Design a protein with these regions (language model features):
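Conserved mid-core segment of classical short-chain dehydrogenase/reductases
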Residues: 90-110, 133, 153-156
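Alpha-helical segment proximal to the catalytic Tyr-Lys
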Residues: 129, 173-174, 246
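Residue(s) in the substrate-gating loop at a strand-loop-helix junction
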Residues: 144
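Short, small/polar-rich loop/turn modules that mediate ligand/substrate recognition or access, typified
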Residues: 176, 181, 248-250
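Short C-terminal tail/terminal secondary-structure segment
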Residues: 226, 237-238, 249-262
């Protein structure tokens, strides 16, 4: 589905980024994997290379405009174009969630909002400037269920996710006439992601239960009585990035297994 597509992935060393990288590689994409720390990204690239995929790595701070810009230009110099930009950056949730808003410091509240909106804006804007020349490309974002429904103890993460979804729609409104699609994924918490386990642990502690019990509680609210997996999210990302989804733009795909009505 993605044969010879050139894809840049931010946060490629994390659970979401690495899952998407493997899925893109399986479908024939040429990958340029990035992260703030090179070691975990190199691990993913080696795994892809060993499976006959194609992946190059770079240390890129997705909050640094010059760092992102230099890297994208290097991709253009090597591959000639950018077909897909997938941002999977994340920040540690310790002290950012699991605390009531009335007790949360303003710095803790503001951090995820500033971090996610800056990163998604920078990576999208700089990729779009290259994509416009070819009048084609796909920019992809990742959010979460709290962007659409009130959930206690989320701190500034929920407002950050809502902002990213608004940015996704606005980017699409401006870029679609120039051949660029902008789409987002909104998965339910994925228990095979280390980040989600950390988040579940923070919320479980506040409820006075184990993270396993908290996970069961969240899963019980879905139609399938289970949670989304990384593989399911990555498979959907493949379709959304492919030419088969050419009519899809300005939308956030709901991967909540029915726990959130559209």
């Amino acid at each position: 589905m993605l044969k010879n597509k050139v894809a840049v992935i931010y946060g490629a060393g994390g659970a979401v980024g690495s899952a998407v990288a493997r899925a893109f590689a399986r479908e024939g994409a040429k990958l340029f994997l990035t992260g703030r720390h090179r070691a975990p990204v190199e691990t993913v690239a080696k795994e892809i290379d060993s499976a006959s995929g194609r992946a190059e790595t770079a240390e890129v701070d997705a909050l640094d405009e010059q760092s992102v810009d230099r890297h994208l230009q290097s991709v253009i110099d090597k591959a000639g174009r950018i077909d897909i930009s997938f941002n999977a950056v994340g920040i540690a949730n310790t002290r950012l969630q699991g605390v009531p808003l009335v007790e949360l410091k303003v710095e803790q509240f503001s951090l995820p909002i500033a971090t996610y909106t800056r990163s998604y804006f920078l990576t999208a804007r700089l990729a779009a400037r290259r994509m416009v020349e070819k009048r084609s490309g796909v920019i992809m974002t990742v959010t979460s269920i709290p962007s659409r429904t009130g959930i206690p103890l989320m701190g500034g993460v929920a407002p950050a996710m809502s902002a990213v979804e608004a940015l996704t729609r606005d980017l699409s409104a401006e870029l679609a006439p120039q051949g660029i699609r902008v789409v987002g994924l909104r998965p339910q918490g994925m228990p095979d992601s280390g980040t989600i386990k950390e988040v579940f642990g923070l919320h479980a502690k506040a409820y006075g239960i184990s993270w396993e019990q908290f996970q069961e509680m969240i899963a019980s609210r879905t139609h399938g009585r289970r949670l989304t997996t990384l593989a399911e999210m990555a498979n959907m990302a493949v379709f959304m990035a492919s030419d088969g989804a050419s009519a899809m733009t300005g939308t956030i795909v709901n991967l909540s297994l029915g726990s959130l009505d559209d």
